A protein has these predicted regions:
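Amide-forming acyltransferase catalytic core, primarily the GNAT-like/NAT-type
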Residues: 1-48
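Conserved aromatic-histidine-acidic binding/catalytic patches
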Residues: 3, 69, 137
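Long, highly charged amphipathic alpha-helices
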Residues: 14, 76-80, 144
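Residues that form generic nucleotide/phosphate-binding pockets
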Residues: 18-22, 37, 80, 84, ...
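Short secondary-structure junctions
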Residues: 25-28, 43-45, 111-117, 157
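Conserved donor-binding loop and adjoining core beta-sheet/short helix segment
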Residues: 28-100
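Hydrophobic alpha-helical segments and helix pairs
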Residues: 92-150
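Conserved small/polar residues in nucleotide/adenosyl-binding loops
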Residues: 151-158
Length: 160
């Protein structure tokens, strides 16, 4: 069985080479994101057979990130994750799979998997100028949130 472990800062040097091999522009493919969200989403990780494997498990929910590393090890990694799910008696599912990553899965396992897009999990992209000004209806909530933060968070001068 795969030995997943809690993500720690000390893992950064070991994990980064695998993440660097990805053609992924998602925040999910960065160590900072993996480390920062690992406590909230119960994310654990390990390096197995030339791939970085990540798992999120909360209660009965179990899901894997797309294995990171050299594509030649992808089939072995996915097979290992699938077996891990069977041993845990859970449905096999992956999260944050890009269309390009899904195409790789489809090459190895034709017709075996389906992709389901969940807009709530998408990364947000903003225009820097509009975000800096926070003008308009679209940014009204963000402007209120920022102003509220400015009221409730004392400046560094006031903290001493």
């Amino acid at each position: 069985m795969i030995n997943f472990r809690k993500v720690e800062l000390e893992n950064q040097k070991a994990y980064k080479p695998y993440m660097a091999q990805q053609q992924c522009r998602s925040c999910e493919c960065t160590f900072a994101n993996l480390y920062l969200w690992s406590r909230f989403y119960a994310v654990t990780a390990t390096v197995e057979n030339g791939m970085l494997l990540t798992k999120s498990e909360e209660g009965y929910y179990l899901s894997y990130g797309f294995p990171m590393g050299k594509p030649k090890y992808l089939k072995e990694a996915v097979d290992a994750l699938y077996e891990y799910s069977k041993e845990k008696k859970r449905k096999f599912q992956m999260h944050n799979v890009t269309p390009e990553q899904f195409a790789l899965l489809e090459e190895i396992y034709p017709g075996r998997f389906q992709i389901e897009y969940r807009r709530d999990y998408a990364d947000y992209v903003y225009e820097a100028e509009k975000l800096a000004k926070l003008s308009g209806k679209k940014y009204h909530g963000k402007k209120n949130h920022t102003n509220l933060s400015l009221i409730h968070i004392p400046s560094p001068r006031d903290r001493s």
